[in-house]
């Protein structure tokens, strides 16, 4: 039994591209710029006073073989989306709402720019508040899961 893997895009790049390509600047009040969205390894130092930041990074991955003999390999990758702003809690909440809206739209298949990859699904898992109130640095970290299915032959 050999496993044949499809050519999958990097899951972190897939999620950050989904956010970047579907971001609507008009949805965040008080700003006319997109936040600095990207993979953790692609972003250099960013001054939060100038721009909001959204970083994506992988935290876990699993493979589950479904079925006996020839079956499916279900690949699941957990991606963290780290949203940070210096403006305040209301802006942080706006960033979070826009990210959730984009992911829900991608899952429903009605986002303007869908996943465009071999990944079958993306879904939201959990959210953590990692704000540092003494530094006035407002953060949410949202975990999402991206899933692929590959044939085992």
Regions found by a protein language model. Give the residues of each.
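Oligomerization/assembly interface segments of phage tail-like spikes and tubes
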Residues: 71-88, 138-149
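Conserved acidic
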Residues: 7, 91, 136
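Small/polar-rich, solvent-exposed N-terminal microdomains that initiate assembly or binding
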Residues: 1-69, 106, 110-116
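Short, conserved charged micro-motifs
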Residues: 88-94
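Short amphipathic alpha-helices in soluble, non-transmembrane regions
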Residues: 95-101
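Acidic-leaning, charged glycine-interspersed low-complexity segments
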Residues: 101-153
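A broad, low-specificity signal marking well-ordered, structured residues that form hydrophobic/aromatic
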Residues: 52-55, 79, 122, 142
């Amino acid at each position: 039994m050999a496993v044949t893997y499809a050519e999958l895009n990097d899951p972190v790049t897939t999620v950050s591209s989904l956010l970047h390509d579907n971001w609507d600047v008009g949805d965040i009040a008080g700003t006319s710029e997109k936040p600095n969205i990207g993979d953790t390894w692609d972003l250099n130092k960013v001054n939060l006073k100038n721009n909001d930041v959204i970083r994506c990074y992988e935290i876990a991955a699993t493979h589950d073989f479904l079925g006996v003999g020839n079956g499916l390999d279900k690949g699941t990758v957990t991606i963290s989306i780290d949203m940070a702003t210096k403006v305040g809690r209301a802006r942080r909440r706006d960033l979070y709402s826009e990210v959730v809206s984009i992911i829900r739209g991608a899952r429903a298949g009605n986002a303007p720019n869908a996943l465009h990859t071999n990944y079958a699904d993306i879904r939201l898992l959990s959210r953590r508040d990692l704000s540092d109130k003494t530094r006035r640095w407002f953060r949410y970290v949202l975990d999402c899961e991206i899933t692929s299915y590959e044939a085992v032959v």
